[in-house]
C-alpha cells in the first residue's frame, strides 16, 4: 500500500529569476565615483583607468567622468572613465 500521493509532472516547472547582469552605464554617459558600469560573470570586460572591479567582477567608477569602451584586441574589451 502506497503512503505517498502520486507526484505528477509539476516537480519540473521551476525557473530561477534573471540575474540582472549587463551594462548599466553606456559609452559617453557621465558617472560619479561608486556608479556601477557593468555587472558581469567573469571578466567579459576588463577594467581600465578610473574604474575598479569588485569580487563578483562588477566594474564601477572610481573617479568622476565619462565612460569609454575600447577593444584591446580581437577578444578583449576594456572600459575606462575619462575625466570630463
Curated annotation (Swiss-Prot):
Annotated GO biological process: translation
Region ranges (Disordered): 1-25
Pfam (any one): Ribosomal_L27
Species this chain originates from: Sulfurovum sp. (strain NBC37-1)
Protein name (database record): Large ribosomal subunit protein bL27
Highest taxon, organism lineage: Bacteria
Entry keyword Magnesium: no
Family indicated by similarity: Belongs to the bacterial ribosomal protein bL27 family.
Alphabetical keyword list: Ribonucleoprotein, Ribosomal protein
GO molecular function terms listed in the Swiss-Prot or TrEMBL record: structural constituent of ribosome
InterPro entries: Ribosomal_bL27 (IPR001684), Ribosomal_bL27_CS (IPR018261)
Transmembrane stretches, start-end: none
Xref: NCBIfam families: L27
This protein's GO CC annotations: cytosolic large ribosomal subunit
Amino acid at each position: 500500500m502506497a503512503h505517498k500521493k502520486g507526484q505528477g509532472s509539476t516537480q519540473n516547472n521551476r525557473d530561477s529569476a534573471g540575474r540582472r547582469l549587463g551594462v548599466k552605464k553606456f559609452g559617453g554617459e557621465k558617472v560619479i565615483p561608486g556608479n556601477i558600469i557593468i555587472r558581469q560573470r567573469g571578466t567579459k570586460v576588463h577594467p581600465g583607468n578610473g574604474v575598479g572591479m569588485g569580487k563578483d567582477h562588477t566594474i564601477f567608477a572610481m573617479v568622476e567622468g565619462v565612460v569609454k569602451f575600447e577593444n584591446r584586441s580581437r577578444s578583449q574589451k576594456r572600459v575606462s572613465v575619462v575625466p570630463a
